[in-house]
């Protein structure tokens, strides 16, 4: 009887360990494939930014394999890419009207954002989670200081920003945005475990073609 009980416990224990390992591996693989998809989208953004509505422009050189990938995969392309070298962040940005432009899925561009266009002043507002989890893209933003660089790639132009101010605000469920005379980019994230948000404002200092 005791042997049977010990054997049952051993089997149950083994199953618990097995399922625990399986869940861990599944979560790891899921995040791995999400990261791979993001890398592919970013690469595609820089290679084929002029492609609109998933149409292949003849002037852009591409391989037969890339054409197959383009035609067979039905996913939305990024409209821009955010890069913060100091915290090793490089993420794509979806259109404001996209269902994927969701803070629980990606870095979100707020509807009040004014995208760069010619000599007009632009104001880009981006929000993301910090803390823990796959979507905590700004988890290391506290390492960012005044004068650190932020890059924003949009319509074949690399916009170069420098962090100009950092401050905290109360989390109220809504964001009051303010527009300056110059062009800027604002990052907003919640401070984990508090009822506050951290705001980074970066001023545009230069732009160049890429």
Regions found by a protein language model. Give the residues of each.
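Solvent-exposed, non-transmembrane regions of membrane-associated and secreted proteins
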Residues: 4-210
């Amino acid at each position: 009887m005791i042997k049977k009980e010990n054997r049952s416990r051993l089997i149950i224990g083994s199953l618990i360990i097995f399922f625990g390992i399986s869940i861990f591996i599944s979560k790891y693989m899921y995040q791995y494939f999400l990261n791979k998809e993001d890398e592919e989208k970013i690469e595609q953004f820089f290679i084929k930014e002029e492609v609109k509505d998933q149409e292949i422009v003849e002037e852009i050189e591409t391989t037969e394999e890339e054409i197959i990938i383009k035609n067979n995969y039905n996913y939305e392309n990024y409209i821009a890419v955010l890069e913060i070298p100091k915290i090793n962040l490089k993420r794509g940005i979806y259109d404001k009207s996209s269902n994927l432009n969701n803070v629980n899925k990606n870095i979100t561009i707020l509807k009040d954002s004014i995208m760069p266009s010619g000599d007009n002043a632009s104001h880009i507002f981006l929000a993301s989670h910090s803390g823990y989890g796959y979507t905590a893209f700004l988890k290391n933003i506290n390492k960012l200081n005044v004068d650190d660089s932020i890059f924003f790639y949009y319509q074949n132009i690399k916009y170069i920003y420098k962090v100009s101010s950092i401050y905290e605000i109360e989390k109220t469920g809504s964001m009051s945005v303010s527009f300056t005379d110059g062009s800027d980019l604002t990052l907003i994230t919640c401070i984990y475990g508090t009822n506050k948000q951290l705001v980074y404002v970066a001023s545009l200092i230069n732009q160049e073609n890429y």
